[in-house]
Regions:
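Donor-nucleotide binding loops and adjacent catalytic segments primarily
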Residues: 1, 152-210
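Active-site and donor-binding regions of nucleotide-sugar-utilizing enzymes
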Residues: 1-133, 146-154, 167, 171-172, ...
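Secondary-structure boundary/capping motif
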Residues: 60, 109-111, 139-142, 161, ...
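Charged active-site motifs of nucleotide-sugar-dependent glycosyltransferases
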Residues: 137-144, 176
């Protein structure tokens, strides 16, 4: 894969005027590059509705064919976006079965692909075995914390999670806590942010934690 623009540094926690400007600037760079230099036969947009729907307008005006994989969840919020999809997207590739009927009812060509995580899900975990494996108390309630998969998220929010969990534990001693360990982050990151807790840090078992 040829990486044209790196979006990894555009993540942000909370509201930031800078991120709005950065998104506008990146959108213009991508649109200009695709329409004036690269000129692809097909553009495949993936997720990221607020950003991709904006650049789809420019790309469509340039006569490009556009597919959208994991389109905006118009069934949950901002239903008006389906009009922009109908106008600028040639085909939607959806991951939920009911989305196919929804988009087709608005005259949008749609193909159901299935959810990419379904094939990866293991069999449901046995609760007693899971508790035993990780040294958890079967007589106490388990609270799972999913602090995010990016280092800056943990940097900004870990202290808040820890304080909130400890406050809850003081008020409700029957609670015990587990932290979901994102596979892309090192053990050292979690040791750094959760070293002063007795929380169990568990990697690769999100379904069981849920």
């Amino acid at each position: 894969v040829k990486l044209l623009f790196d979006q990894s540094k555009m993540g942000v926690v909370g509201l930031s005027p800078k991120i709005i400007f950065d998104h506008i600037l990146l959108g213009k760079k991508i649109s200009d590059y695709l329409t004036k230099e690269y000129k692809p036969d097909l553009v495949l947009l993936i997720d990221y509705g607020g950003f991709n729907l904006n650049i789809s307008k420019v790309l469509k005006r340039a006569g490009m064919k556009i597919f959208y994989y994991i389109p905006p969840q118009v069934w949950a919020s901002r239903k008006w976006r389906i009009n922009a999809i109908k106008k600028n997207i040639d085909e939607v590739l959806c991951i939920f079965p009911f989305e196919k009927g929804l988009y087709e009812s608005h005259g949008i060509k749609t193909h159901y692909c299935g959810h990419p995580l379904v094939a990866q899900l293991p069999a449901p975990a046995d609760k007693s075995e899971f508790f035993k494996k990780h040294g958890l108390d079967t007589n106490r309630k388990l609270v799972s914390i999913f602090p995010g998969s990016r280092d800056f998220e943990l940097k900004n929010l870990a202290k808040v999670f820890v304080k909130s969990a400890k406050d809850l534990q003081r008020k409700h001693p029957e609670l015990q806590f587990c932290i979901s360990h994102a596979p892309n982050l090192s053990d050292e990151v979690y040791d750094k942010y959760f070293k002063d807790t007795d929380f169990k840090i568990i990697k690769g078992e999100n379904q069981a934690l849920l």
